[in-house]
Amino acid sequence: MYRTAAKRLLAGGGITTTRLLRLPKLRSTIIPSSYTSGLCTSSIGGNTESPMGNQSVNPNQSGPTASSSTGTGEGQRRHESRKPRAEFQEEQARVLSASLRHVPRLGWTEEAMMAGSRDVGVSPSIVGSFSRKEAALVEFFMDECLQLLMDRIDSGLDLQNLIPSERIFKLIRIRLEMQVPYMSKWPQALSIQAHPLNVPTSFKQRAMLVDEIWHAVGDGASDLDWYVKRTILGGVYSTTEIYMLTDDSLEHRDTWAFLDDRVKDAFDLKKSIQEAKYFAEDIGAGVGKSVQGLMNGVMQTMSRRSGGSAF
Amino acid sequence: MALRSVSRRLGSRILNQRSFVASLHSHATSFGFQEVKEEEKSKLVGNVFTNVASSYDIMNDVMSGGLHRLWKERLVGKLSPFAGMKHLDVAGGTGDVAFRIYDAVYSVKRRALQKVDEASLEETQIYVCDINPNMLNVGKQRAAERGLRDNKSLVWVEGDAEALSFDDNSMDGYTIAFGIRNVTHIEKALAEAYRVLKRGGRFLCLELSHVEIPVFKNLYDLYSFQVIPNLGELIAGDRESYQYLVESVRRFPPQERFASMIADAGFEKVEYENLVGGVVAIHSAIKL
């Protein structure tokens, strides 16, 4: 998060230099990475930095609009009739978007992306420049689905009349239904996301998804910790996603039944954890009001017991 | 007052242009550390490569300790060749990069893993362009040794990087390995590269570049100026050519400057990667 903010700042600051006007984009993408001779022990830190700069579609957009206008100014100095420059991020997004059509047939592969690039009218060579190629396609899809979900929520999904567990059910169902057209190739997407190089980004995307769902559900009357909430929802989402892979029922009825059960389990879990907490607090109230008091109480109890058994 | 500010702006712009042009022309009139006339530079470079052609590959191996193979592998890896691509390798005389691209496209393992259309395989064209016919002959010989003499995918063309004989928007990929240093006008070569590439086509340049790391830089300079010309004398019998080589590396623009030149030619997403601490750099860009 701090990295993308810093890049945005750099891009904004670089616009004012008159000599090398296209460098703002350069600064965010030129990452000179050093390799030791022959061994190619590439620093993974260095590698993951450039994908972050390219993959996240939003942060760089403050740069391009400004640089394209100054770019045309410089273009006039030298060559009048230069057509407007397409920003690489936009081009990548267009190619990936067109590639999604080919995924059910060709899978989440370079072939699908090359077919997509041909549809857009760009040489398939461009696929060679996407970082972590297939992962770029999967991550693009995940981002798109999240955006679609957010749009659906904003355009007035009827959540007010539902209790939290039903809201969660509805949101997860909407999100999973977006994957239905690609269900035959979804296992491949999951394995791509699980690849060590891709885990940071896929984890981040799932975290954002879960965050968004909780945000839409509203916090409700829950005492659970922020992380625990998201972890549990992440678990419910992932298990349902995997269940869906092998579900042949009509309109995935079995999946929704499974999802319903899991959401209820999660809320029951919440209730039972809450009960355990009240119980613990009652014990704590006996020896002191705070959790620290409970700890001390436990320690005291334990030390008392061990002292007793020594005799 | 307005006039003064206008003239100051004009003056600074002219000054910028002049210094810009001057720094470019310094490459055009430099033959290593010597100053030569522009018209003469290409002739002098031509002589160098005519002399070294036959021992070019051996000298590469000796000077880089075999590392140049890894660098070229990395270059082709970055390119990600695909079946049916039209690729241009400029200044690729002896065919190192071209053969690697050929192998990458035609490798049986790759074909098995991906569903490659046989028809598109046939359409693959790899053009090897070099200004020096001697270097091309060595390349053709090596092709014959590999059994690729009559292969239609490999096309050997004699031509000038500053004035290519290919159509606009005809190439999916353009590579130049250890060649752009020898071109008289770098910006012309870059402009030609931009011209022949299709939209979405990639430009990749592998070149000896500048080392900034303190102690390593000194070692590298020592190696370049003391060891390499002697190796040249010993193995190729030509000290001057290798003296030119190490000097021309120093006169070539550093990584950032070259990257900005590439961006000025119109390319997008200009990036570079240093190998061996900057001894070699791979610059990549896309035409959009």
Curated annotation (Swiss-Prot), chain B:
Write out the entry's keywords from A to Z.
Membrane, Methyltransferase, Mitochondrion, Mitochondrion inner membrane, S-adenosyl-L-methionine, Transferase, Transit peptide, Ubiquinone biosynthesis
Q: In which pathway does it act?
A: Cofactor biosynthesis; ubiquinone biosynthesis
Question: How is this protein annotated for GO cellular component?
Answer: extrinsic component of mitochondrial inner membrane; mitochondrion
A Gene Ontology molecular function term of the record: 2-methoxy-6-polyprenyl-1,4-benzoquinol methyltransferase activity
Which leading EC class covers this enzyme? transferase
In this chain, S-adenosyl-L-methionine is annotated as bound at T94, D130, D160, A161
Q: Which InterPro entries match?
A: SAM-dependent_MTases_sf, UbiE/COQ5_MeTrFase, UbiE/COQ5_MeTrFase_CS
Give the enzyme's EC designation.
Answer: 2.1.1.201
Work out whether the entry's keyword set contains Membrane.
yes
Q: How does it sit in the membrane?
A: Peripheral membrane protein
Q: Where is the transit peptide?
A: 1-27
Instruction: Quote the subcellular location field of this record.
Output: Mitochondrion inner membrane
Q: Does the keyword Secreted apply?
A: no
Q: Give a Pfam family name.
A: Ubie_methyltran
Major location (coarse): mitochondrion
> In its UniProt record, which GO terms are filed under biological process?
methylation
Query: What is its quaternary makeup?
Result: Component of a multi-subunit COQ enzyme complex.
Task: Write out the function statement from the record.
Answer: Methyltransferase required for the conversion of 2-polyprenyl-6-methoxy-1,4-benzoquinol (DDMQH2) to 2-polyprenyl-3-methyl-6-methoxy-1,4-benzoquinol (DMQH2).
Q: Which family does it belong to?
A: Belongs to the class I-like SAM-binding methyltransferase superfamily. MenG/UbiE family.
Q: Which protein is depicted?
A: 2-methoxy-6-polyprenyl-1,4-benzoquinol methylase, mitochondrial
Q: Which organism is it from?
A: Arabidopsis thaliana
Q: What is the lineage of its organism?
A: Eukaryota, Viridiplantae, Streptophyta, Embryophyta, Tracheophyta
Name of encoding gene: COQ5
